[in-house]
Amino acid sequence: MAFDEGREEGDSDDGRLNGLGNAEEGTQIVLQTRYAFDADWRYWLDGRVVTGDTGSLALLGAGRRFGEQKNGTGSELSIGAVIHNSELANKDFGITSAQSVASGLNRTSLGGGFRSLGLNYTYRNYINDNWQIFGEVLYERFGSDVADSPITRSNYEAEVGVGFIYVF
């Protein structure tokens, strides 16, 4: 289970979302599987489907784990392609006629299909018996339909994250 936090009109500090209203929140179901090419999980394929009341997407990726650890720690580098249905594409990047009038942005309707290619680096390390620290850097290059939406500022998205994982 996951939660899509939606988008609030006030999320943009420079007013780029003014007139678009809030994009709805929703719950999602996430199904994921990985296939290892060897016993050490050095090279793997990853498939993920995310679906919910705000739309669906699928991700297909491949990655490599670095280091000699066999406890889930260390570094991974992966590349992935994302496709989405039109419902999710328009929730995230579309502009309805009413939103166009209110915002002054061009009406934009997207179809489903290719969303992006991404490159992801992750690092995990134990800080004690049950806690791990987690770091992630992600670069996602949008496909033409998404990149052309007036909502996007550029043709890519970059994220950096740090977190903690409790291992039972």
Language-model segment annotations:
Residues 1-78, 87-112, 152:
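Outer-membrane pore/translocation modules
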Residues 2-6, 50-52, 82-88, 132, ...:
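Structural signature of outer-membrane beta-barrel domains
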Residues 27, 56, 83, 115-117, ...:
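Transmembrane beta-barrel architecture of outer-membrane proteins
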Residues 38-42, 70-74, 126-130, 157, ...:
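Strand-connecting loop/turn motifs
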Residues 42-44, 74-80, 132-136, 161-163:
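Residue-level detector of the transmembrane beta-barrel scaffold of outer-membrane proteins
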Residues 62, 155-168:
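Outer-membrane beta-barrel "beta-signal"
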Residues 105-118, 124-126:
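A conserved mid-domain beta-alpha-beta active-site/ligand-binding segment of alpha/beta enzyme cores
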Residues 144-151:
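Low-complexity, intrinsically disordered Gly/Pro/Thr-rich segments
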